[in-house]
Amino acid sequence: GEGKAVTNPMLDLDDFIGLQFTTGPDGNLYQLPDQQFANLYWFRKDWFDRPEIKKQFKAKYGYELGVPLNWSAYEDIAKFFSEDVKTIDGVNIYGHMDYGKRAPDLGWRMTDAWLSMAGAGSKGLPNGVPVDEWGIRMEPGSCNPVGANVSRGGATNGPAAVYAIRKWDEWLRAYAPPGAAAMDFYQSLPSLSSGNVAQQIFWYTAFRASLVGKDPNNKVVDANGMPLWRMGPSPKGPYWEQGMKLGYQDVGSWTLFKSTDVERRKAAWLYAQFAVSKTVSLKKADVGITFVRKSTINHKHFTK
């Protein structure tokens, strides 16, 4: 094609993660991934590993304290830390964190696969077909929406969606720190560094950089700056079935418009390839801890 002469032969498309998100229904690749982050489960591993806490939890619930596989176990853990443990090392602690301020990002809180984590939508990856993770039904073989309401074949007001929003509200009020309901996305997620939260079911990995490294205000690392926390797979809700999407992945990508002059497109394409080159991707991962290439994930910077 017209961009062949300005395409890096070392681009190595097979090295990218998230290509399925930038591939159309026709099988063609329409965008080039530049950055990505996921939404996962976050927890204080150091607290979960304390023998006295593990013993107390098992005595009450009859199973081992660990990464919850479902929302029921997550709620048990939230209730346990908020109402039974209450304080650790003299600090008041809570079993859950979230946000509820009326702001645009509260929309992301729901649309970033929260409904499908509960079990709304159809089976299929990266999106459910014919009903996606937003609960919107699509026309067969296209991205044209038909409807979101159950009466139109959608799922945004179905049992799983209603359950998901109810649990978001219940947990926020019952188990999160005071003031969490008045926080937005940008205040809530980095606030875990204050060190008073045991777990969070809906945590964006884009905020990892704010929770690592030596900083007197960062209470979730040890004396050497190593994280006291870990991430795990998203717990699934009661309506979730095998084959449904679980969790969320965001893939920011380069897109070049046909309407742009071809010479300007070529220049943009050269810059895009520079921005996602293996050396630049590695540097971006060192700083922001977001990954877009397999070679970055497997690099010695992150595998020691």
Language-model segments: which ranges?
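Short helix-initiation/N-cap motifs at beta->coil->alpha
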Residues: L69-A73, G179-S193
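Extracytoplasmic/periplasmic substrate-recognition and gating elements
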Residues: T23, R173-A176, D215-I297
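Alpha-to-beta junction loops
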Residues: V91-I93, S193-W203
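Extracytoplasmic "Venus flytrap"/periplasmic binding protein-like
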Residues: G1-D15, N28, P51-E52, Q56, ...
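Hydrophobic residues within well-ordered alpha-helices
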Residues: Y74, F81, W114-L115, P190-G195
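Glycine-centered hinge/linker elements that transmit conformational signals in sensory
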Residues: A73-A78, G119-A182, G225, R230, ...
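Hinge/lid segment of periplasmic solute-binding proteins
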Residues: G1-W42, L228-S234
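Beta->alpha turn/N-cap motifs
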Residues: F185, F202-F207, S234-P235, G252
